[in-house]
Amino acid sequence: MSYNLTDPYEIARYIKEAKKSTPIKAYIEGDLSNCDFTNIEKFNSGDLYILFGESEEILVIIENNKDKIKNCRIEQDRRKSAIPLLDMLKVNARIEPGAIIRDKVLIGENAVIMMGAVINIGAEIGEGTMVDMNAVVGARGKLGKNVHLGAGAVVAGVLEPPSSDPCTIEDNVLIGANAVILEGVKIGKGSVVAAGSIVTTDVPENVVVAGAPAKIIKEVDVKTKDKTKLLDDLRK
């Protein structure tokens, strides 16, 4: 079944209808030679087993064979999860450890996703764009090419409450640390959002905004461009 991920109600329907998953990893020492491992990925040597699968299936095996098990350790990182994480092997970008990127996200060539960044379903990250440490791109947020989203900054999602207009950050925009771009706001090409700003209305091209709520304080000039230039070496 296909879903229109530009529509917040379709995303909500996708989450509702998705099979919820609680995958676990189990490390077991014991005799499980007579067990049925259907739907479970199993690796073993002798009495040592590593199992990957849904919690309800693996826990049944553990419970039914507890007298044969010497040691057991279980690892899990989610419960009743509706959306898997993105398969990063298919992305030609630099993605650092600790970034959380949900499936159905588009990431452009040579983008950089730093530690602790969170990118939600339906978001788009343009070519050469950096999402810095602990920054958040909410559902359906759109970042153009060569954008810098500063550490701790937030591009609000438009899933709940639902909105038809996502946040749009156009090409060559720099958003300072801990800035917040509210739902549906558009930031024009080449503009700069000062650190800590709260942007509540659309921003035209090639201006600098600052404050809470953010207001235009000047046009982008040579000095501003020099202070906010990106480093290509970070994107190689």
Curated annotation (Swiss-Prot):
Pathway: Amino-acid biosynthesis; L-lysine biosynthesis via DAP pathway; LL-2,6-diaminopimelate from (S)-tetrahydrodipicolinate (acetylase route): step 1/3. It is an enzyme of class 2 (transferase). GO terms for molecular function: tetrahydrodipicolinate N-acetyltransferase activity. One of its GO terms (biological process) is lysine biosynthetic process via diaminopimelate. InterPro entries: DapH, DapH_N, Hexapep, Hexapep_transf_CS, Trans_hexapeptide_repeat, Trimer_LpxA-like_sf. It comes from the Bacteria. Its EC number is 2.3.1.89. The keyword Cell membrane does not apply. It catalyses: (S)-2,3,4,5-tetrahydrodipicolinate + acetyl-CoA + H2O = L-2-acetamido-6-oxoheptanedioate + CoA. Keywords: Acyltransferase, Amino-acid biosynthesis, Diaminopimelate biosynthesis, Lysine biosynthesis, Repeat, Transferase. Disulfide bonds: none annotated. Gene3D superfamilies: Hexapeptide repeat proteins (2.160.10.10), Malonyl-CoA ACP transacylase, ACP-binding (3.30.70.250). CDD domains: LbH_THP_succinylT. Belongs to the transferase hexapeptide repeat family. DapH subfamily. Catalyzes the transfer of an acetyl group from acetyl-CoA to tetrahydrodipicolinate. This is 2,3,4,5-tetrahydropyridine-2,6-dicarboxylate N-acetyltransferase. It comes from Clostridium botulinum (strain Okra / Type B1).
